[in-house]
């Protein structure tokens, strides 16, 4: 895609998000042609958000890390989207349904990296300095900004931050104080009723 179309596509997605609307699809001539275009559009959208003080990207969420979600969305690999400072909450948050297009809730683990690292595609879990990481129990507030996301192509989903919206972080804990990080169970309870349960071993065998 040429830079002009990337900016136009990012502008459409940014405006749709700001207005809390649902989009049928990105116009054909502005759709990302591949995953590289998708992330370029996403990056441009983040630039727009920062320019208009809607929010600054401070991190990333990784979606479709479980085989269940990849099968559900018919996607072969994990995808990432931006986390904005204006969408980052600590310990608790009061939110109105009307502040989203079609919100959902997911239990997550958030990771704060205390210093910069360089990894290759061949990096193994044993090479990651866990003592340099701080972990948070987290709740992700996802938002479906599509009229029918099931017919939206993967690249368009990525360009739009892959359902990213907000995150609520719990109390931090150094990773070396957590035993069996690859076998932790998380439960989602709403009004005293458990509605979901997951295990970190399902996150590509290890959450880190």
What residue spans do the PLM features occupy?
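Catalytic-core "active-site belt" of small-molecule-metabolizing enzymes
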Residues: 2-206
């Amino acid at each position: 895609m040429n830079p002009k179309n990337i900016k136009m596509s990012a502008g459409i997605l940014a405006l749709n998000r700001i207005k809390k609307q649902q989009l049928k699809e990105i116009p054909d001539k502005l759709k990302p042609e591949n995953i590289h275009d998708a992330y370029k559009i996403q990056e441009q959208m983040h630039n727009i958000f920062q320019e208009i003080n809607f929010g600054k990207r401070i991190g990333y969420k990784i979606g479709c890390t479980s085989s269940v979600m990849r099968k559900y969305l018919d996607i072969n690999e994990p995808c990432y989207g931006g986390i904005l400072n204006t969408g980052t909450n600590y310990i608790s948050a009061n939110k109105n349904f009307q502040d989203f297009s079609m919100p959902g809730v997911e239990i997550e683990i958030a990771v704060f990296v205390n210093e910069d690292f360089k990894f290759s595609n061949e990096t193994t879990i044993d090479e990651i300095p866990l003592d340099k990481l701080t972990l948070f129990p987290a709740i992700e507030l996802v938002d479906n900004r599509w009229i029918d996301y099931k017919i939206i192509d993967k690249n368009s989903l990525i360009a739009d931050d892959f359902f990213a919206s907000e995150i609520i972080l719990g109390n931090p804990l150094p990773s070396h104080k957590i035993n069996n990080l690859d076998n932790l169970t998380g439960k989602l309870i709403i009004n005293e009723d458990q509605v979901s349960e997951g295990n970190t071993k399902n996150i590509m065998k290890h959450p880190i």
